[in-house]
Curated annotation (Swiss-Prot):
This is ATP synthase subunit c. InterPro entries: ATP_synth_csu_bac/chlpt, ATP_synth_F0_csu, ATP_synth_F0_csu_DDCD_BS, ATP_synth_F0_csu_sf, ATPase_proteolipid_c-like_dom, F/V-ATP_Csub_sf. The gene is atpE. The chain crosses the membrane at residues 11-31, 53-73. The record marks 61 as: Reversibly protonated during proton transport. GO terms for cellular component: plasma membrane; proton-transporting ATP synthase complex; proton-transporting two-sector ATPase complex, proton-transporting domain. Belongs to the ATPase C chain family. NCBIfam families: ATP_synt_c (TIGR01260), PRK06876.1 (NF005363). GO terms for molecular function: lipid binding; proton-transporting ATP synthase activity, rotational mechanism. Pfam families: ATP-synt_C. It is a multi-pass membrane protein. F-type ATPases have 2 components, F(1) - the catalytic core - and F(0) - the membrane proton channel. F(1) has five subunits: alpha(3), beta(3), gamma(1), delta(1), epsilon(1). F(0) has three main subunits: a(1), b(2) and c(10-14). The alpha and beta chains form an alternating ring which encloses part of the gamma chain. F(1) is attached to F(0) by a central stalk formed by the gamma and epsilon chains, while a peripheral stalk is formed by the delta and b chains. It comes from Blochmanniella pennsylvanica (strain BPEN). SUPFAM superfamilies: F1F0 ATP synthase subunit C.
Amino acid sequence: MEHLNFDMLYIAAAIMMGLAAIGAAIGIGILGSKFLEGAARQPDLIPILRTQFFIVMGLVDAIPMITVGLGLYVMFSAV
């Protein structure tokens, strides 16, 4: 019975990391489409939009990195 709990812990950590990666991919895709839409509407604002795009993309991409760290911590500290 004890092995079942560890198996569920590993599965939960894997699901947590996978869903975070999928969510970030969807978020960056939407962010990129909105950036291109804004750049097409107002080409003179491209430098400002690009700066904001990379800042927000870094924040969106940080969430899966934090989740991977937490998932690995949960997987390896529970043993």
